[in-house]
């Protein structure tokens, strides 16, 4: 299913199958663009999931945001790390609340969440368990 279907003003044009797993991973660009009101990007995700549900989708894997402060774009200072990790936590909290609401509203929806935030924190705390050695520095000093 294309994003064009999700953005269509004609929901009947969208067809989804109940047996397909729909993976939803979004929000980082909103935070990169300075969004601090998490209801905006989470609301957009909710609308997209609702459209897919209306079109027939029933199985979803929703991936939360990693701690964006640890990404090369933001790991230059402790202040920036803290700011973007906090924003990621705020987004993830709003996302979890929204997903719980969808589960309550739709008894036939299967919503599973992949907690990437915790996975990244686990890798930073115990890099050897993941076969990693340096989890704090950027791999490249190049500016994109």
Give short role names for the model-derived ranges.
Residues 2-39, 58-59, 66-74:
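Oxyanion-hole/transition-state-stabilizing segment in secreted/luminal serine hydrolases
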Residues 49-50, 54, 63, 100, ...:
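Helix-boundary and membrane-interface capping/anchor signal
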Residues 61-63, 90:
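A sequence-level detector for low-complexity, Ser/Thr- and acidic-rich stretches
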């Amino acid at each position: 299913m294309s994003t064009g279907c999700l953005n269509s003003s004609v929901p009947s044009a969208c067809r989804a199958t109940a047996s397909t797993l729909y993976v939803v991973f979004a929000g980082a660009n909103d935070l990169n663009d300075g969004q601090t009101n998490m209801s905006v990007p989470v609301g957009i995700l909710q609308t997209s999931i609702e459209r897919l549900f209306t079109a027939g989708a029933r199985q979803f894997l929703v991936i939360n945001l990693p701690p964006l402060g640890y990404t090369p774009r933001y790991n230059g200072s402790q202040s920036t790390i803290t700011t973007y990790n906090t924003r990621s936590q705020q987004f993830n909290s709003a996302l979890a609340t929204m997903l719980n609401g969808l589960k309550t509203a739709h008894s036939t929806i299967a919503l599973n969440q992949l907690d990437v935030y915790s996975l990244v924190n686990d890798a930073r705390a115990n890099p050897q368990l993941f076969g990693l050695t340096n989890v704090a520095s950027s791999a490249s000093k190049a500016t994109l």
